[in-house]
Each structure stands twice: as C-alpha cells, then as structure tokens.
C-alpha cells in the first residue's frame, strides 16, 4: 500500500515466516506467554513494546502462533486493553507535540502544514475504528483535549 502524504510507493515489507507452526526450540507454553503479556501490560507497556520484548528476550517471534490470539486480544480478554488503539494514540501524541512546538515557534509554517496532515490522518483512522467498533461512535478528536488523552 502506498504512503498517504508522501510520493513513496511503500513496496518494502517484512518477510513473514512460511511455517505457521510453533518452532520446536521454543520452550514457552501458551499459558506462560499469556502470563508474560499480562505481566508486561501491568508495567504500563503498549502492545507493540510487549511484542518486541517477547521477541528479543524470550524468543517468541509471533505471539499469535504460540497462543492462537494476538496481544491486543489477550489484553482485551483480561480487561487490560488500551482504550485508544495504539496507532491512533501515537498520531495524537505526535499532533500534541507539534502543537506544543507551534506555541513556541509561531512562524514555523512547515510544522503548521505537517500538523494539518497529521490531524487528517487522525480523522481518517478514527473513522475506520468507528466502523470497526473499536472506538465509540461518539468519539471525536479535539485538539484542546488531545493532551489529556496521551498523558
């Protein structure tokens, strides 16, 4: 898929392993991996950070192959899922940082333009998550309350 506000074609992608079974050298069971996921979530880590730690420290390449569920679904079952999806959270965080920058540097026209692009991505992603019912239908992005969402 191509990039949204960029001329790049977006061709490169990570290579997924062909075999969909659990590696024979992995010693962790499904219950142990789920326990690790909940333990890391209690520390305040986001799902992508949990996946990186499991990959680097414990050798779990893909949690879904071991447990049968994705990290977010495991967290949802335990009632620990983030209220805002992670990609939307990071876009809101970026918009808040750009706004903070613009308060100090009012003449920075390029940052003002980039803020418009980031906020259009936020609105598009929010519309997608509303149709998928991962966000309530009444949820709305407002720049005045955005800093409270990411703090």
From Swiss-Prot:
Q: Which UniProt keywords apply?
A: Ribonucleoprotein, Ribosomal protein
A single Gene Ontology biological process assigned to it is: translation
| Family annotation (PROSITE patterns) | RIBOSOMAL_S15 (PS00362)
Which InterPro entries is this protein grouped with? Answer: Ribosomal_uS15, Ribosomal_uS15_arc_euk, Ribosomal_uS15_N, uS15_NS1_RNA-bd_sf
Fetch the Pfam families from UniProt: Ribosomal_S13_N, Ribosomal_S15
Q: Among the entry's GO cellular component annotations, what is one?
A: nucleolus
Keyword Transferase on this protein? Answer: no
- For the keyword Manganese, the answer is no
Q: Which domain of life is it from?
A: Eukaryota
Which Gene3D superfamilies has this protein been placed in? 4.10.860.130, S15/NS1, RNA-binding
**GO MF annotations in UniProt:** small ribosomal subunit rRNA binding; structural constituent of ribosome
NCBIfam families, per the entry? PRK08561.1 (NF006331)
Recorded family membership: Belongs to the universal ribosomal protein uS15 family.
**What HAMAP family has UniProt attached to this entry?**
Ribosomal_uS15_A
| Name the record gives this protein | Small ribosomal subunit protein uS15
Q: Which organism is it from?
A: Brugia pahangi (Filarial nematode worm)
Phylogenetic placement of the source organism: Eukaryota, Metazoa, Ecdysozoa, Nematoda, Chromadorea
């Amino acid at each position: 898929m191509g990039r949204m506000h960029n001329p790049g074609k977006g061709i490169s992608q990570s290579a997924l392993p062909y075999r969909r079974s659990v590696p024979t050298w992995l010693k962790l069971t499904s219950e142990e991996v789920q326990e690790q996921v909940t333990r890391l979530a209690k520390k305040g880590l986001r799902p992508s950070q949990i996946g990186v730690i499991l990959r680097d420290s414990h050798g779990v390449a893909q949690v879904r192959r071991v447990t049968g569920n994705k990290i977010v679904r495991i967290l949802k079952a335990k009632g620990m899922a983030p209220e805002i999806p992670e990609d939307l959270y990071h876009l809101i965080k970026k918009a808040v940082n750009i706004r903070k920058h613009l308060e100090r540097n009012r003449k920075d026209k390029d940052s003002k333009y980039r803020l418009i692009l980031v906020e259009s991505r936020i609105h598009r992603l929010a519309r997608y998550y509303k149709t998928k019912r991962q966000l309530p239908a009444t949820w709305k992005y407002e720049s005045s309350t955005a800093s409270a969402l990411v703090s």
